[in-house]
């Protein structure tokens, strides 16, 4: 009888009788900054603005293939693997599980920036124990694969040769090694490292790996990073559910470089759209707050692949030279063209931008007129989508809206009213076409030249 009584005793059931079910509190939300084109939109600059009053700044995907330049007090800092918020002495920088880490690259980057004045970074950096490691042979393989592609197809992907793709390949084929493996039993790690190296050598006959030399270095790096490593899932959970905190997520690469949604195969090997934030940090979607898309006032692309609004002419040259369009990571000349709103709308469909940052508006100051790509035509017919297939994307014709240039210097503008009416019209046109407000307009290199509109 006692068993029945227990089962009828409503008080033993949470939520039964007079007891309220525990209400799930969402906790703090993260603010996300993502590239809305092919990268190099100026994400670092927006991060820098928001990082000054953030408590935690996170990276969730990619590796040191990203390049962010931040100018503080006249000093230019270059970040590849570090969140660019590492400059903020009051904030914690977190490298999430979705990031792939080349340890020599991490310390080289630290040294370079220390020489410029970065202090105590190791006290502010936390690394997820689940992040995968980029080995030197991954980088070598990256280069060898590119040579192979060039020989077989006469074209390459335009990789940064930082070993990112091969590392994500190891991760997907479940042979990769993580930070937690490096910090556990080193004999076990060494055995798995040797297997992984041999596996790559069997695929690439001319790949040389100094296994013992590498392991010696890795053992040294293990001790250097040990104090910085935490279980990333628990770290993020505490950050979200502890005291109120401002948490910023700095996306690397951009929407059209996303492994799923980008211009495949000319993409990177991770998700650089909003989904990568959840998988790369181990947080639920309800903790994603504002998502800011960063878009340049024109379009650039590094390496090969379709680029519908590209201008291989005087306009392209003006944008390239005025915009100093050279890659931070590769030093390669960027291809330039008109602003493409088909791409921007597509990026918004995937990411759900709550607002945009429109950067480098000042580069357009000298132009007599501007064109904005508003639709694609295929065989003379308007198509209502962004084509997935690269051969089709190569064939589209762009429908342009032509707008008169403002022909005046905007670099001194610090508020909306300082901008010429025609520049204001250009911005409003973008907002109305995409249906997302522009929150910042960039008219120069410094922090002060980001005009905040609301």
Curated annotation (Swiss-Prot):
The active site is at 40 (proton acceptor), 68 (proton donor). Homodimer. NCBIfam families: PRK01117.1 (NF002223), purA (TIGR00184). Keywords: Cytoplasm, GTP-binding, Ligase, Magnesium, Metal-binding, Nucleotide-binding, Purine biosynthesis. SMART domains: Adenylsucc_synt. Mg(2+) binds at residues 40, 67. Component of the purine nucleotide cycle (PNC), which interconverts IMP and AMP to regulate the nucleotide levels in various tissues, and which contributes to glycolysis and ammoniagenesis. Catalyzes the first committed step in the biosynthesis of AMP from IMP. Binds 1 Mg(2+) ion per subunit. GO terms for cellular component: cytoplasm. It is found in: Cytoplasm. Pathway: Purine metabolism; AMP biosynthesis via de novo pathway; AMP from IMP: step 1/2. The keyword Magnesium applies. Its EC number is 6.3.4.4. Substrate binds at residues 40, 328-334. The keyword Glycoprotein does not apply. GTP binds at residues 39-45, 67-69, 334, 360-362, 442-445. It catalyses: IMP + L-aspartate + GTP = N(6)-(1,2-dicarboxyethyl)-AMP + GDP + phosphate + 2 H(+). Residues 1-24 are annotated as: Disordered. SUPFAM superfamilies: P-loop containing nucleoside triphosphate hydrolases. GO terms for biological process: 'de novo' AMP biosynthetic process; IMP metabolic process. IMP binds at residues 40-43, 65-68, 160, 174, 253, 268, 332. GO terms for molecular function: adenylosuccinate synthase activity; GTP binding; magnesium ion binding. It comes from the Eukaryota. This is Adenylosuccinate synthetase isozyme 1 A.
């Amino acid at each position: 009888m006692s068993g029945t009584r227990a089962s009828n005793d409503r008080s033993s059931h949470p939520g039964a009788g007079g007891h309220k079910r525990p209400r799930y509190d969402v906790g703090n939300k993260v603010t996300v900054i993502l590239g809305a084109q092919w990268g190099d939109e100026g994400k670092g600059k927006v991060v820098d603005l928001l990082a000054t009053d953030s408590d935690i700044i996170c990276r969730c995907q990619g590796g040191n293939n990203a390049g962010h330049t931040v100018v503080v007090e006249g000093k230019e800092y270059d970040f590849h693997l570090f969140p660019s918020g590492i400059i903020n002495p009051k904030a914690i920088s977190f490298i999430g599980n979705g990031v792939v880490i080349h340890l020599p690259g991490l310390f080289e980057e630290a040294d370079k920036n220390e020489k410029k004045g970065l202090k105590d970074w190791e006290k502010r950096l936390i690394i997820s124990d689940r992040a995968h490691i980029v080995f030197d042979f991954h980088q070598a393989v990256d280069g060898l694969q590119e040579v192979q592609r060039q020989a077989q197809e006469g074209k390459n992907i335009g990789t940064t040769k930082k070993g990112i793709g091969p590392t994500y390949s190891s991760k997907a084929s479940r042979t990769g090694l993580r930070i937690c493996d490096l910090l556990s039993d080193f004999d076990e790690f060494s055995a798995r490292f040797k297997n992984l190296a041999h596996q790559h050598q069997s695929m690439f006959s001319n790949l040389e790996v100094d296994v013992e030399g590498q392991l010696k270095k890795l053992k040294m790096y293990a001790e250097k990073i040990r104090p910085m490593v935490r279980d990333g899932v628990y770290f993020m959970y505490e950050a979200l559910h502890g005291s109120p905190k401002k948490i910023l997520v700095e996306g690397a690469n951009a929407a059209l470089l996303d492994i799923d949604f980008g211009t495949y195969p000319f993409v990177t090997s991770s998700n650089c759209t909003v989904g990568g934030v959840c998988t790369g940090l181990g947080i639920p979607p309800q903790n994603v707050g504002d998502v800011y898309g960063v878009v340049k006032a024109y379009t650039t692309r590094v390496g090969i692949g379709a680029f519908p609004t590209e201008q291989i002419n005087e306009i392209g040259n003006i944008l390239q030279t005025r915009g100093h369009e050279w890659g931070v990571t590769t030093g390669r000349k960027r291809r330039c063209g008109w602003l493409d709103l088909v791409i921007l709308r597509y990026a918004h469909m995937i990411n759900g931008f709550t607002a945009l940052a429109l950067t480098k508006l000042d580069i357009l100051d000298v132009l007599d007129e501007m064109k904005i790509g508003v639709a694609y035509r295929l065989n003379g017919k308007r198509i209502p989508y962004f084509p997935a297939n690269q051969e089709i994307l190569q064939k589209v014709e762009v429908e342009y809206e032509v707008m008169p240039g403002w022909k005046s210097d905007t670099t001194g503008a610090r508020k909306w009213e300082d901008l010429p009416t025609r520049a204001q019209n250009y911005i409003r046109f973008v907002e109305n076409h995409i249906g997302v407000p522009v929150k910042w307009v960039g008219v120069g290199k410094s922090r002060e030249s980001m005009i905040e509109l609301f």
